[in-house]
């Protein structure tokens, strides 16, 4: 009986960790990795196609988009929103690295 108890508890622990998902933390903020992935997709759609338009800030465009994840909206109110979104985009570029907790900002593996 005890032979099966330990492996069962281990499997339950792994399942509980995976069910909670991966959390990305940046300062006072904490987001699901899924929201960060959506942000990356949205930023790729919003990148200007005309090289002359690179001077304008992209934050208002992102924050006002109807596809912008609700979970990330508090970032838009911060003066350093662009810096935070850049850090999140770095994580989103390779989400598999975050899923194995290679970044200190990621938790819940």
From Swiss-Prot:
Keywords: Disulfide bond, Secreted, Signal. This is Guanylin. Endogenous activator of intestinal guanylate cyclase. It stimulates this enzyme through the same receptor binding region as the heat-stable enterotoxins. The keyword Disulfide bond applies. Disulfide bonds join 63-76, 98-106, 101-109. GO terms for cellular component: extracellular region. Belongs to the guanylin family. It comes from the Eukaryota.
